[in-house]
């Protein structure tokens, strides 16, 4: 054991010797040994990317240690009480620069099996003390110092006043001088309390406006995991630290006001103490309000009379949960105007723009250290729409869910009302409204800012932001985002621009360009075309899209350029301009006379793919051999094909299936009958982005049929017998 002790780093060895000092720390071991063991027995350990959590745990542990000393010492004789208090304060203050290291030393002793992991974290904790901490952790560290200094000054001032109370009758003149000195210290202490509150407000605003908002952005775009976005569990530890610091500050102010110090407090200072106490309570209310968040958002496109769910969470620790109980939470739906009124007054109200079924729940503590209210079966039964402008559609109107709760902290004259809003939602009554509803949501999510007026959006946003959001939407809904080439094609499509892809950071696009204005050549908008492609991928092509077998968003001329030097039978898949939600096959065709052309098969739509999948159709066509550039067709699509054999209705029948074939229109040149005619060949206008497709029709009119199965061997035999 002695050998292992000497192997410890010098700073830790020094702290260990301090722990075993025979003067004061022995009292800590005697009176708080079991408490320390219980506190650290199940203390969490962290992986390498969460080393900063040890700093928070260490600060909370030693703050709790001093508080535990106060409770234990209440039943001790005065002399022993003072010794115990001083030993606890000395233990913490003398190791302030290495609190995390001391905490890990204790953790090694209580949890030997985590020693290896903790040693790793100890090394990292040392490096993080060189300034590589988050701004929140630095602010919390400052607050811990301020709170501890306030505690020391409060205790010192009270002790001096108690001593003076005994001596003042014997020496009145000296007592008057002391009063002046106390008044200065009292003023300094009040100022220190005020600085602590202001610093706490600064840290809280940083946590809420920056880190909570960054976390909410991941709700808007779930597939994005920002390196700056902390998990809610980590953010909760920040809230817990703020709550502990301010609760201790409230106790310090209360102790100052209730002790014998009142005999020395001037009227002005006494009034300031009451004001500071009010400020602390107001901060605790604000902290709880900003700790109330929507963890699982309701759908942002909400269909009437359709079930949906949501979850709210209060980011506080067990100590406050015990004071709160299980308060009720109510949910209502409010309009954009009502949301703005709540935002401007910073107070919830009995607003409602509709009726929600199963809208009442309770906050309950979970074993995962979460304080949640789950709403798993809500249903929007009624919606009250506002007076819409003449040119404003139903899908342009935004709503939000308002979650509210109210509770009183036990043994405290402190009633707290908390509320929070969901992300904006569009309410629809029919599924065909979903397409335009998503334009409103995507645009709003892109324009979301922590300090904006709910739910106002600008008319223009940068194209780069929009196309990034579109890519994230594809990633979330169909499993893969867009390539740079896809984005280039979309840029030309959105701006109707034939120039090369070169977008500056200040290139803007309007909401009308995005989803209102139709193209002159085609009677649909950019978003309608894009959404139709997204929908057919989601419903019929997702596995192919994720597997990168579909290029999809590529211009016709670019596809022809890619295929121009490929061997006959090479093909690629692209979404067409002329048919919404249509996917076409471009392939290299070689005629009987050896001439090669890039031809395009008539687009398949969702109706076609319901009958027979795209993978099966591709395998039907012997003309197609290689997926661009050189992937054998069976290798790319074989695992996605499935036999479409239908069981006969009775044993007297056999089944047949439909297959896709190409129908080449007859050519005026009989010597080249297999070559498409001029109307089907690439025209001189093929470089025009919005030119009509030149196509070869695919034969789907070979329906499933049944044949009597007596002595018949083939379809031909059957017809010959008729």
From Swiss-Prot:
GO CC, sorted alphabetically, is:
cytoplasm; nucleus
* Localization per record: Cytoplasm; Nucleus
Sorted alphabetically, the keyword list is: Activator, Cytoplasm, Developmental protein, DNA-binding, Nucleus, Phosphoprotein, SH2 domain, Transcription, Transcription regulation
Give the matching InterPro entries.
p53-like_TF_DNA-bd_sf (IPR008967), SH2 (IPR000980), SH2_dom_sf (IPR036860), STAT (IPR001217), STAT_linker (IPR048988), STAT_N_sf (IPR036535), STAT_TF_alpha (IPR013800), STAT_TF_coiled-coil (IPR015988)
Domain named SH2: which ranges? Answer: 545-644
Q: In which residue ranges is the amino acid composition biased (Polar residues)?
A: 675-689
Q: Which stretches of sequence are listed as region Disordered?
A: 667-689
Give the superkingdom in one word: Eukaryota
- Give an example GO molecular function: DNA-binding transcription factor activity, RNA polymerase II-specific
Q: What does this protein do?
A: Signal transduction and activation of transcription. Plays an important role in the segmental pattern formation in the early embryo by activating specific stripes of pair rule gene expression. The STAT pathway directly participates in immune responses in insects.
- Which family does the UniProt entry place this protein in? Belongs to the transcription factor STAT family.
Q: How does it assemble?
A: Forms a homodimer or a heterodimer with a related family member.
What is the protein's name according to its record? Signal transducer and transcription activator
């Amino acid at each position: 054991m002695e050998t292992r002790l000497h192997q410890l780093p010098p700073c830790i060895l020094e702290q260990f010797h301090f722990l075993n000092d025979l003067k004061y720390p022995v009292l800590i071991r005697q009176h708080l040994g079991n408490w320390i063991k219980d506190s650290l027995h199940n203390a969490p350990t962290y992986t390498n990317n969460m080393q900063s959590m040890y700093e928070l745990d260490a600060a909370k542990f030693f703050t709790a240690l001093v508080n535990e000393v106060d409770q234990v010492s209440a039943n001790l004789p005065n002399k022993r009480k003072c010794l115990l208090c001083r030993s606890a304060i000395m233990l913490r203050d003398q190791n302030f620069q290495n609190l995390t290291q001391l905490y890990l030393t204790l953790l090694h002793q209580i949890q030997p099996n985590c020693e290896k992991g903790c040693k790793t974290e100890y090394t990292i904790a040392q490096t993080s003390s060189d300034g590589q901490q988050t701004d929140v952790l630095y602010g919390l560290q400052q607050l811990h110092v301020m709170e501890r200094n306030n505690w020391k000054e409060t205790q010192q001032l009270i002790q001096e006043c108690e001593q003076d109370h005994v001596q003042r009758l014997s020496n009145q003149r000296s007592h008057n001088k002391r009063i002046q000195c106390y008044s200065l210290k009292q003023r300094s202490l009040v100022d220190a309390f005020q600085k602590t509150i202001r610093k706490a407000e600064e840290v809280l605003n940083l946590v809420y406006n920056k880190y909570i908002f960054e976390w909410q952005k991941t709700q808007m775009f779930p597939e994005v995991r920002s390196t700056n976005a902390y998990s809610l569990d980590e953010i909760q530890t920040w809230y817990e630290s703020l709550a502990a610091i301010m609760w201790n500050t409230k106790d310090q102010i209360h102790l100052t006001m209730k002790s014998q110090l009142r005999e020395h407090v001037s009227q002005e200072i006494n009034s300031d103490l009451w004001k500071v106490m009010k400020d602390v309570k107001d901060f605790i209310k604000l902290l709880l309000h900003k700790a109330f968040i929507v963890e699982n958002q309701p759908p942002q496109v909400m269909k009437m009379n359709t079930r949906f769910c949501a979850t709210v969470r209060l980011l506080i620790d067990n100590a406050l949960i015990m004071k709160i109980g299980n308060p009720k939470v109510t949910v209502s739906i409010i309009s954009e105007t009502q949301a703005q009124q709540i935002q401007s007054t910073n107070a919830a109200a009995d607003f409602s723009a509709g009726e929600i079924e199963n809208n009442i729940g309770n906050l309950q503590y979970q074993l995962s250290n979460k304080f949640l209210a789950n709403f798993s079966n809500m249903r929007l039964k009624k919606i009250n729409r506002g007076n819409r402008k003449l040119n404003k559609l139903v899908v342009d109107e935004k709503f939000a869910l308002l979650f509210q709760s109210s509770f009183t902290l036990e043994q405290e004259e402190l009633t707290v009302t908390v509320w929070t809003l969901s992300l904006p939602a569009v309410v629809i009554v029919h599924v065909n409204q979903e397409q335009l509803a998503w334009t409103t949501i995507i645009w709003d999510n892109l324009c979301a800012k922590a300090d904006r007026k709910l739910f106002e959006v600008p008319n223009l946003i940068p194209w780069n932001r929009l196309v990034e959001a579109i890519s994230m939407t594809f990633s979330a809904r169909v499993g893969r985002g867009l390539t740079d080439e896809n984005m280039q094609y979309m840029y030309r499509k959105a701006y109707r621009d034939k120039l090369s892809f070169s977008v500056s950071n200040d290139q803007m696009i309007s909401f009308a360009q995005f989803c209102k204005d139709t193209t002159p050549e085609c009677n649909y908008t950019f978003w309608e075309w894009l959404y139709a492609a997204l929908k057919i991928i989601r419903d019929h092509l997702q596995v192919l899209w994720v597997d990168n077998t579909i290029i999809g968003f590529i211009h016709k001329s670019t596809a022809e350029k890619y295929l121009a030097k490929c061997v006959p039978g090479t093909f690629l898949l692209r979404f067409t301009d002329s048919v919404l939600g249509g996917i076409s096959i471009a392939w290299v065709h070689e005629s009987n006379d050896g001439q090669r052309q890039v031809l395009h098969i008539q687009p398949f739509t969702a109706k076609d793919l319901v009958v027979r999948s795209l993978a099966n159709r591709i395998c039907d066509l012997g003309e197609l051999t290689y997926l661009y550039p050189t992937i054998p067709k069976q290798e790319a699509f074989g695992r996605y094909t499935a036999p479409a054999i239908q069981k006969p209705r009775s044993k007297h029948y056999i089944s047949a299936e439909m297959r896709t074939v190409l129908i080449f229109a007859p050519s005026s040149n009989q010597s080249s009958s297999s070559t498409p005619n001029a109307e089907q060949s690439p025209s001189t206008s093929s470089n025009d982005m919005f030119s009509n497709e030149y196509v070869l029709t695919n034969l789907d009119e070979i329906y499933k049929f049944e044949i009597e199965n007596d002595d018949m061997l083939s379809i031909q035999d059957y017809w010959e017998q008729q």
